[in-house]
Amino acid sequence: NLADIAIVWAQTDEGIQGFVIEKGTPGFTAQEIKHKMSLRASVTSALFFDNVRVPDSSRLPNVKGLKGPLGCLTQARYGITWGPIGAAIACLSEAVDYTKERILFGRPVAATQSAQIKMAEMARRITLAQLLVLQLGRLKDAGTMQPQQVSLAKWNNCRMAIDIARECRDLLGGAGITT
């Protein structure tokens, strides 16, 4: 809905190829997907093609087969490895602020050793995730990043963010489950 172009991969007589489809091309429409359960920070659209014809000049040069779309997917997934880090940092920041203000048995929850250990462990895991994707970025810049490395980083960082979100929810007590 927002983009002026779409990069589309399609099966042709010559195999899978990429095409640039411009907004306004007859037969091409995009419909925003609303009420998503995830990826809510960005607009996602369903693309519809009804007898769309594109000129040969719209074909992506030097890209044939699945290598093109899978390469794009790997690059996109690399970007996704960073998102959970931001989510985990936001959760930890909220937990730190809350535990400093929440008084329990005459002192802030943040003053208890158990809360401090939990928050230090969360900070350690966030730092490890940051270092992981920093190294992955270095490999990407060097042209040696492998898809399986991206998969492992995404898996690690998503798991880390989920674990930290749960731990922070527990630190917030009842405030962690209300709006």
Where are these regions (language model features)?
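Glycine-rich phosphate/pyrophosphate-binding beta-alpha loops
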Residues: 1, 39, 75-79
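Short glycine/proline-enriched turns and hinge-like loops at secondary-structure junctions
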Residues: 1-3, 40-42, 61-62
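A short core secondary-structure module
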Residues: 1-30
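Basic, amphipathic alpha-helical recognition segments used for DNA target recognition
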Residues: 21-26, 56-58, 89
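Flexible, small-/acidic-enriched active-site or ligand-binding loops
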Residues: 24-53
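A short, charged helix-loop
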Residues: 45-71
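Alpha-helical interface subdomain recognition
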Residues: 46-48, 71-179
